[in-house]
Amino acid sequence: MALDLLRSSLGFLTTLPVKGDVDVLRRNLWVFSFVGIFIGSVISIPAVLGFWFLCVLLYVAIEGVNHIDGLADFGDAFFAPEERKKVAIKDLNLGTGGAVFLCVYFLILFYSFQRVSAFYIIFSQVLAKFSMLLLLTTSKPAWQGMTGFMMEFARKRDVVIGSLPLLLVVLKPLAVFPLLFAITISLLVKRYAEEKFGGVSGDVVGASNCLVFAGSLLVCYFLAD
């Protein structure tokens, strides 16, 4: 069971060539936050070795572009007229809003990786995955699809267990600031999605992951010694 969950979570949340059972994953959504520790640790390796400029490339390589694509679609919907927001977030073409979101996103990553420590990179990635968990367990699907399928067995237990990696904050008390920021952004994205789309979609969940990751890194950037 544990090995199946490990394979399923890594296969779903990373580009690693492992096969798993998505049914196992959707019954154990709490694992998202723990996968964040793994992804963050891998991303932080170049920074520890002094090659911080490789962090962005490694991040894209290990996490893929699904969440980034979600951020772009969310950006298009955010800037779209009220009556076209649902159409915009489903549109496969990149619009101006999405391009703006992507440019700002990668600029934040590029500059943040120069200064933040490995701990904050890992913690920011944990917060990003916890954000995804929070949306999947506390909201409703905007329409039928993979997101609704993943949310079918979401329980409060997932949030409780998924919160355990957040205890990393005790190692660096200042980490409470990116933690509070991440929760705030997650709740704002959730509220926005429910008002504009009637719930969350895969793009919304992916966008929340990116927004929280970049935002938390930016907060950590200003906290850096």
From Swiss-Prot:
It catalyses: alpha-ribazole + adenosylcob(III)inamide-GDP = adenosylcob(III)alamin + GMP + H(+); alpha-ribazole 5'-phosphate + adenosylcob(III)inamide-GDP = adenosylcob(III)alamin 5'-phosphate + GMP + H(+). GO terms for cellular component: plasma membrane. The gene is cobS1. It is a multi-pass membrane protein. Its cofactor is Mg(2+). The keyword Cell membrane applies. Disulfide bonds: none annotated. GO terms for molecular function: adenosylcobinamide-GDP ribazoletransferase activity; cobalamin 5'-phosphate synthase activity. It comes from Archaeoglobus fulgidus (strain ATCC 49558 / DSM 4304 / JCM 9628 / NBRC 100126 / VC-16). The keyword Ribonucleoprotein does not apply. This is Adenosylcobinamide-GDP ribazoletransferase.
